[in-house]
A protein has these predicted regions:
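Short helix/loop capping segments that flank catalytic or ligand/cofactor-binding pockets
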Residues: 41-42, 60, 148
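Short, small-residue-biased leader/transition segments that mark boundaries at the very start
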Residues: 2-7
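Extended, compositionally biased non-globular segments
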Residues: 47-142
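Short consensus segments that form the blades of beta-propeller domains
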Residues: 39-41, 128
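Surface-exposed ligand/attachment interfaces on beta-rich extracellular proteins
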Residues: 11-19
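Extended extracellular/luminal ectodomain segments enriched in beta-structured repeat modules
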Residues: 23-30, 43, 113
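TerminUS-proximal long segments
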Residues: 109-193
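A short beta-strand element within beta-rich, extracytoplasmic domains
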Residues: 26-38, 117-122, 194
Length: 194
């Protein structure tokens, strides 16, 4: 018996994290990208999508976060290159915690005449909740108007998540789900049937 799973990927950028929304003519030259993951799950399968000059479908469509930042296989060590690198990784418990990556397109800038929109999925097909922030770098032929900065509360990083927090959340989830023996990781000792 053969089973197939059909996954419909996003190609229009809807729901993705927006790291650049530029109007005018110029060249995109880089990004610093910060991820705070509340889970040890690998966050890096989010595809990057760059829409040039008002495209509805991205002409630059990547294959995953780590690929966009010139790495592969879920990097867990710090490394630095002039044009890309992982400046911070939390190697204590999977990918729980904060990561900082960067990429500069100095030798291969992305040119645009009217606009550039850069997005990246948070997890494969936006399946993860992540605290993401970024800084985009570009040169522009004329000064543009930037949107107002978000309120301070929206720009403040979320509290650092520790292993204990995950256990507490899991305990609450199990309690709310009935603490049954069918739940994954059954650490509750149920009384045997008498």
């Amino acid at each position: 018996r053969q089973r197939q799973m059909c996954i419909r990927d996003s190609v229009d950028g809807a729901g993705n994290y927006l790291f650049a929304d530029i109007k005018g003519e110029g060249q995109f030259v880089g990004i610093n990208y910060y991820v705070h993951s509340p889970s040890p799950m690998w966050y890096g399968e989010g595809d990057d999508m760059i829409f040039i000059d008002g495209e509805e479908k991205a002409s630059l469509l990547g294959t995953g976060t780590e690929d966009f930042f010139n790495t592969s296989w879920c990097p867990k060590t710090i490394f630095a290159h002039p044009y890309y690198g992982y400046a911070r990784v939390n190697n204590d418990n999977g990918w729980l915690g904060r990561t900082h990556v960067y990429r500069f397109f100095i030798s291969d800038p992305i040119y645009f005449e009217k606009s550039l929109k850069g997005t990246i999925e948070h997890g494969h097909n936006n399946n993860l909740t992540l605290d993401i922030s970024s800084v985009a770098y570009w040169y522009q032929s004329e000064a543009g108007i930037l949107p107002p900065a978000p309120p301070k509360a929206d720009r403040t990083p979320k509290e650092f998540i520790r292993d204990q927090d995950m256990h507490r959340w899991r305990h609450e989830w199990r309690k709310n789900s009935g603490n049954g023996s069918k739940l994954w990781g059954n650490e509750v000792n149920e009384k045997p049937n008498t």
